């Protein structure tokens, strides 16, 4: 019975005296009557529409459904009686009990007569809700102890639901004296059993010390659960670790959230005894130290993970402004210019990132399956092309954004980890980056530096948007409805035009999950270099003086709200004409990719599959969502196809020999291909031949010598042949 009779935990109200316990019963009765009047008489409505008794009707409806709880809004209580609301804010532990007793009495009145078998009146749980501005975990100090607080955050761990006694019965082992119906304080509060038996011992031997034990079958218990709340990522100061807070939920508040949920908590800021620093407790170091937790009285959950908390704060004036913005004929260009305006160029990439931020429409099919609406994007190419800067901007711009680096991210850190709870010694689950970013964007930098095992772990999260865990006896599925924006470098550091697909070191399984793949090259163009240098110098010179945004751009805060508003309010679908057009174009794309593979005599590392068809649908829906339109038009499909063409399709069709220096024409590429085929026919795998004789034979066939050297160089880099005997002989490996 160690869970019931642990004497090492103290409740916050018992810390510092029994002043509250000495208050008169008359005052409590009066306050309870006032709470009862509030629940019975509070009305909503107008003279024209008629009045309804809000809480009285809610109590009756919930009770008849077998749900013994009611949610009270603090603003309603304040409008009815400010003193009552003030008492509840400053001394919630005492006054919440009076409010629950009042709710039980009102429920008794409104549910009479009850059906046979249900005559026993059930206890009512009161949950609290408030529209007040929330505090942060960092702002909770000792002067707020035992007060009502409102805290936002992310649930990162949840324990199993367990039982806690609210009323216990104890019995003496020696004389069988029984004490029944002993009330327990709520929260993480234990009960210290009496050390001595208080019965009359006349004519009987004295009972020994510590004679009482708990009778579990005569205890009244409720469910309880402990949660771990973490600060929101955008509330953590730079360079600091996010802080955590333990939460205690009971009764109907259990199992309302899972790791990864963004929540706002209403509760009592309480304390419990800090763990002893020595194993046996001989040195009672830290006797006066208490650790804090929150006894939860209400939970508001961002259920769909789409930034609803942001959209809920949109005023009617802002809504009208957003609708005017969406109605602009060039809203697509305005938004794309607002994506990282300090970065020069990359227009198509910025347009693609704008589509990623808005996302497509998530669809639930009749058979229960879902199709993701979030867009995944990969930027692949040279260093110094502002890939990481774009990632940082998207993290700030997205309503929910998590930034991580590939080298410092493990599979468990990205998905979810199972660890042992230090208090209960049970296994609990903590969500990783992709769970915490549910409803937002995960930005993964240095994607190519990740270990292959860790990269495979996010396959399911990217396509099915769930994370399935089967570890340490825990088998569950977490939501990770987020977009992935990844940046990676070429295998050789810089993009080497002579190596074609060898620059890409990713498996087709991961590449097919990206809706758009941009190959970013640092091209040497004098005119572009002049403009780029001018732009960068201007940024550095005017960094201290330029405070206003460039003409025609949307500022970051407004853009962030507009994205959240569109994601919640709009879920467009393809129109019939757009769907027909897309079907025809997809067939042409597939046949073009197949013809390219046949001509180049090798499969592309970037496949064109049905996933890419769905990608174009999502891009078209995102373009429609920017305009708050219910259907994606043919123009949206045309732009989606263009974006797909300049990104993934161009990357997939970049053949092995395309773009080689000095061989840009189709005829030259065909010549190189012919040389390679003849060379492979010339000597089999495992055989060797003199390099000098190879060059001599091909020059006799009127092939240019530099072309023969280029083919040999390409085959050497691909590992198909290797030099032997002081680079005089070529040996074929594959």
UniProtKB/Swiss-Prot annotation:
GO-annotated molecular function: ATP binding; ATP hydrolysis activity; DNA replication origin binding; helicase activity; single-stranded DNA binding
An annotated GO cellular component: nucleus
Reaction equation(s) it catalyzes: ATP + H2O = ADP + phosphate + H(+)
Ranges where the MCM domain occurs: 331-537
Modified residues (N6-acetyllysine): 392, 396, 696
Subcellular location(s) of the protein: Nucleus; Chromosome
The keyword Hydrolase belongs to this UniProt entry's keyword annotation: yes
Stored SUPFAM superfamilies: Nucleic acid-binding proteins, P-loop containing nucleoside triphosphate hydrolases
Chain positions recorded as ADP binding sites: 371
Gene3D superfamilies assigned: 2.20.28.10, mini-chromosome maintenance (MCM) complex, chain A, domain 1, Nucleic acid-binding proteins, P-loop containing nucleotide triphosphate hydrolases
PTM-bearing positions, type Phosphoserine: 315, 605
Pfam families, alphabetized: MCM (PF00493), MCM5_C (PF21933), MCM_lid (PF17855), MCM_N (PF14551), MCM_OB (PF17207)
GO process annotations (BP): DNA replication; DNA replication initiation; double-strand break repair via break-induced replication; regulation of DNA-templated DNA replication initiation
SMART domains, per database record: MCM
Annotated positions of the N-acetylserine modification: 2
Entry's disease: Meier-Gorlin syndrome 8: A form of Meier-Gorlin syndrome, a syndrome characterized by bilateral microtia, aplasia/hypoplasia of the patellae, and severe intrauterine and postnatal growth retardation with short stature and poor weight gain. Additional clinical findings include anomalies of cranial sutures, microcephaly, apparently low-set and simple ears, microstomia, full lips, highly arched or cleft palate, micrognathia, genitourinary tract anomalies, and various skeletal anomalies.
Miscellaneous comment as given in the Swiss-Prot or TrEMBL entry: Early fractionation of eukaryotic MCM proteins yielded a variety of dimeric, trimeric and tetrameric complexes with unclear biological significance. The MCM2-7 hexamer is the proposed physiological active complex.
Function text: Acts as a component of the MCM2-7 complex (MCM complex) which is the replicative helicase essential for 'once per cell cycle' DNA replication initiation and elongation in eukaryotic cells. Core component of CDC45-MCM-GINS (CMG) helicase, the molecular machine that unwinds template DNA during replication, and around which the replisome is built.
The protein's assembly and partners: Component of the MCM2-7 complex. The complex forms a toroidal hexameric ring with the proposed subunit order MCM2-MCM6-MCM4-MCM7-MCM3-MCM5. Component of the CMG helicase complex, a hexameric ring of related MCM2-7 subunits stabilized by CDC45 and the tetrameric GINS complex. Interacts with ANKRD17. Interacts with MCMBP. Interacts with TONSL; the interaction is direct.
Family: Belongs to the MCM family.
Protein name: DNA replication licensing factor MCM5
């Amino acid at each position: 019975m160690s869970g019931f009779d642990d004497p090492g935990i103290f409740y916050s109200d018992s810390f510092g005296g029994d002043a509250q316990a000495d208050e008169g019963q008359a005052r409590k009765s009066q306050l309870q009557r006032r709470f009862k009047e509030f629940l019975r008489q509070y009305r909503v409505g107008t003279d024209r529409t008629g009045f309804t008794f809000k809480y009285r009707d809610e109590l009756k409806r919930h009770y008849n459904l077998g749900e013994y709880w009611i949610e009270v809004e603090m603003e309603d209580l304040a409008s009815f009686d400010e003193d009552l609301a003030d008492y509840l804010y400053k001394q919630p532990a005492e006054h919440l009990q009076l409010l629950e007793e009042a709710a039980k009495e009102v429920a008794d009145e409104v549910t009479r007569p009850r059906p046979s078998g249900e005559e026993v009146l059930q206890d009512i749980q009161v949950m609290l809700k408030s529209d007040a501005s929330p505090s942060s975990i960092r702002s909770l100090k000792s002067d707020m102890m035992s007060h009502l607080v409102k805290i936002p955050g992310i649930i990162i761990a949840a324990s199993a639901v367990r039982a806690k006694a609210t009323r216990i019965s104890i019995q003496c082992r020696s004389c069988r004296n029984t004490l029944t119906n002993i009330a327990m304080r709520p929260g993480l509060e234990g009960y210290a059993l009496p050390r001595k038996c208080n019965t009359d011992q006349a004519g009987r031997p004295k009972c020994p010390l510590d004679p009482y034990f708990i009778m579990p079958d005569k205890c009244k218990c409720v469910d309880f659960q402990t949660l771990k709340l973490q600060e929101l990522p955008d509330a953590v100061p730079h360079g600091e670790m996010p802080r955590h807070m333990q939460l205690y939920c009971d009764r109907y508040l259990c199992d309302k959230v899972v790791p990864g949920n963004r929540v706002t908590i209403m509760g009592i800021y309480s304390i419990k005894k800090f763990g002893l620093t020595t194993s046996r407790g001989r040195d009672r170091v830290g006797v006066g130290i208490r650790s804090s937790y929150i006894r939860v009285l209400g939970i508001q959950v961002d259920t769909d993970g789409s930034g609803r908390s942001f959209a809920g704060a949109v005023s009617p004036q802002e809504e009208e402004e957003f609708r005017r913005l969406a109605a602009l004929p060039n809203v697509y260009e305005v938004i794309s210019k607002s994506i990282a305006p300090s970065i020069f160029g990359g227009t198509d990439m910025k347009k693609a990132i704008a589509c990623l931020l808005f996302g497509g429409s998530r669809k639930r099919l009749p058979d229960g399956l879902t199709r993701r609406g979030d867009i995944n994007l990969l930027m692949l190419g040279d260093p110094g092309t502002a890939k990481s800067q774009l990632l940082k901007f998207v993290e700030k711009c997205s309503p929910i954004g998590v930034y991580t680096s590939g080298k410092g991210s493990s599979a468990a850190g990205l998905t979810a980890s199972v660890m042992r709870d230090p208090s209960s010694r049970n296994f609990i689950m903590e969500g990783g980056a992709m769970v915490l970013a549910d409803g937002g964007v995960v930005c993964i930098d240095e994607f190519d530096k990740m270990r292959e095992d860790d990269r495979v772990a996010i396959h399911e999260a990217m396509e099915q948007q769930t994370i399935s865990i089967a570890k340490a006896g825990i088998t569950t599925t977490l939501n990770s409805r987020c977009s992935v924006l990844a940046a990676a470098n070429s295998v050789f550091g810089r993009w080497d035009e002579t190596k074609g697909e060898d620059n890409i070191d990713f498996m087709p399984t991961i590449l097919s999950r990206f809706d758009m793949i941009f190959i970013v090259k640092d091209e040497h163009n004098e005119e572009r270099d002049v403009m780029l240098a001018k732009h960068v110098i201007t940024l550095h010179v005017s960094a201290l003086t330029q405070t206003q945004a460039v003409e025609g751009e949307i500022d970051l805060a407004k853009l962030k709200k507009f994205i959240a508003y569109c994601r919640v309010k709009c879920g467009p679908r393809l129109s019939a004409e757009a769907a027909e057009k897309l079907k025809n174009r997809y067939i042409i794309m597939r046949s073009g990719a197949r013809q390219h593979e046949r001509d180049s005599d090798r499969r592309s590392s970037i496949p064109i599959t049905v996933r890419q068809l769905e990608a174009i649908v999502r891009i078209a829906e995102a373009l429609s969502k920017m305009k708050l339109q219910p259907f994606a038009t043919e123009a949206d499909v045309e732009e989606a196809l263009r974006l797909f063409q300049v990104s993934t399709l161009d990357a997939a069709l970049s053949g092995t020999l395309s773009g080689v220096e000095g061989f840009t024409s189709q005829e030259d590429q065909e010549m190189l291909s012919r040389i390679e085929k003849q060379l492979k026919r010339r000597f089999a795998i495992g055989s060797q031949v003199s390099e000098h004789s190879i060059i001599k034979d091909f020059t006799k066939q009127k092939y240019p010598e530099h072309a023969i050297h280029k083919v040999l160089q390409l085959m050497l880099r691909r590992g198909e042949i290797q030099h032997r005997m002081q680079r005089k002989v070529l040996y074929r490996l594959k």
